[in-house]
Amino acid sequence: DMDNIPFTPPSKKIKSDYMWRDIERRAKFYGFEAKVPAPYPLTQFDLANQIAILGMNEGWGVKYVVKTYQRWFQQGKEPAVEPNLTEILEELNLDTSKIMERAQDPKINHQYIKNTEHAYKKGVFGSPSFIYKGEVFWGDDRLEDCIKWSKLN
């Protein structure tokens, strides 16, 4: 659901500029440079997410997600469009055509829908989100808060 896009409308330029700068700072905390603004909002994301689900089921999903985000935030390449999808899968030495076909299998799509519904029911509205005993913490900068909260409860 992309109805809650934080970087638009143009009337929110001050907030948008702040958010992109914050992403740059957070990236530096993790030891890499972010090329911002990155393509956003995304024009497509379902297939990329379905590929990630397939990959998580098969053990290569984390590598796929890391490469996807590196290309997005370090190279400015939108995650779910070609040739980016194919290039990522090739870098991982995966059979691109088979992965594309299997990622669109109704079982994977069903899992994608169920995962999304589960997230909504838990109160997740953005990424990254962390949940501890029903409490939602949204944003990379809230991970520490989630950990502190878990120690208090």
State each model region's role:
Residues K67-N153:
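C-terminal cap of thioredoxin/glutaredoxin-like
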Residues D1-W72:
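Structural alpha/beta surface segment adjacent to cysteine/selenocysteine redox centers
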